[in-house]
Amino acid sequence: MSENIILKIVILGASTVGKTSIFIRYFQKEFKTTITSVGVDFKPKFFKLEGEKIKVNYIDTAGQEKFKSISQNYLKSTDGVILVFDITNKETLDLINYWEDFINKNSKPNIGKILFGNKLDLADNREVEYEEGKNLANKLKCKYYEDRRKYRIYYE
């Protein structure tokens, strides 16, 4: 399939927020509760929109400090970012501001962003209310979604 448009989307967030679980759920249609990311994984997804063939390369990054330089390199040419936090861990929402600065310093201007509150299946342990995520998304001028790790509601 020859693509008319090729996009790159990087998934960023702190360690243990479920970035890799989202990635695996989206591409392999399975759910794993414990996955350790080491470095970077990437996979393409193909779409057709209004007659245009689109290839989107999704890049899953490890959240550990030692992998920041890898994330930094991918950001230079990325078209969009999915910022992920864990709704059961307030600190991961607070770290989104760090990631926003990281993106602003290392990517092209006006990059597309989505803020994604993960682990809605653990809502009984919720530390971040929907409104908090939505307010931060408004501040970052991006869309906000929440989802369960186990189910694929908003991924497409």
Where are these regions (language model features)?
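TRAFAC-class small GTPase G-domain
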Residues: M1-E156
